[in-house]
């Protein structure tokens, strides 16, 4: 498979799965191994094309992001207060990721670790959906700093490739009293600062792996990731208001089982 075609495939996978509770990184690792696109350069490529998915969320929620940087507060979740909550959500995983980045790439970027994370995350989704916690937060404007920090702590689980940042933050929000649709919406918006910082940091650290000839491939992955993320996020916004997360948990278990039983030893 040519690098350009690999970029298209991986861009679709990244955009379609980044904001679903199924783990985009886990899917990229599995698909990368299947198409022979592996190694340190491939791992960094997977992280860098996240920028396309990030931009998709910014476009979909552009008004919310504008309110965050606008000097005049428009809602409770805007201006300095909104930025402060996003900072609190990004802080725990950001600090741990900064310290453990090399170890995570060295020991957890493999199909077996991904399959285990998919399984653990699926079990947790089932448990969270059985929760008896009463919803206390229904909109972004009802978010509190404590809720934002709590979701950020759950986000640390996403440092395990295959667990899913989206799953971790949505489950965390639900356990802390957020309505499922609010937890999903905040998961999208709250992802942007951490993902943007992680992508830029990874590119800075791995820039020596890429040459000018790779810019075209990176561009393809970026554009395809952007388009597929736009479609996926819009669809998920509708779905999460109508169904639970259980179908995604069953999918995770099925994919994990396929890896455990059929992946070459």
UniProtKB/Swiss-Prot annotation:
It catalyses: di-trans,octa-cis-undecaprenyl diphosphate + H2O = di-trans,octa-cis-undecaprenyl phosphate + phosphate + H(+). Its main location: membrane. One of its GO terms (cellular component) is plasma membrane. It is a multi-pass membrane protein. GO terms for biological process: cell wall organization; peptidoglycan biosynthetic process; regulation of cell shape; response to antibiotic. Belongs to the UppP family. It is found in: Cell inner membrane. Pfam families: BacA. The chain crosses the membrane at residues 19-39, 42-62, 80-100, 108-128, 143-163, 181-201, 220-240, 243-263. Bacitracin is thought to be involved in the inhibition of peptidoglycan synthesis by sequestering undecaprenyl diphosphate, thereby reducing the pool of lipid carrier available. It is an enzyme of class 3 (hydrolase). This is Undecaprenyl-diphosphatase. It comes from Solidesulfovibrio magneticus (strain ATCC 700980 / DSM 13731 / RS-1). GO terms for molecular function: undecaprenyl-diphosphatase activity. Catalyzes the dephosphorylation of undecaprenyl diphosphate (UPP). Confers resistance to bacitracin. Keywords: Antibiotic resistance, Cell inner membrane, Cell membrane, Cell shape, Cell wall biogenesis/degradation, Hydrolase, Membrane, Peptidoglycan synthesis, Transmembrane, Transmembrane helix. PANTHER family: UNDECAPRENYL-DIPHOSPHATASE. Its EC number is 3.6.1.27. The keyword Membrane applies.
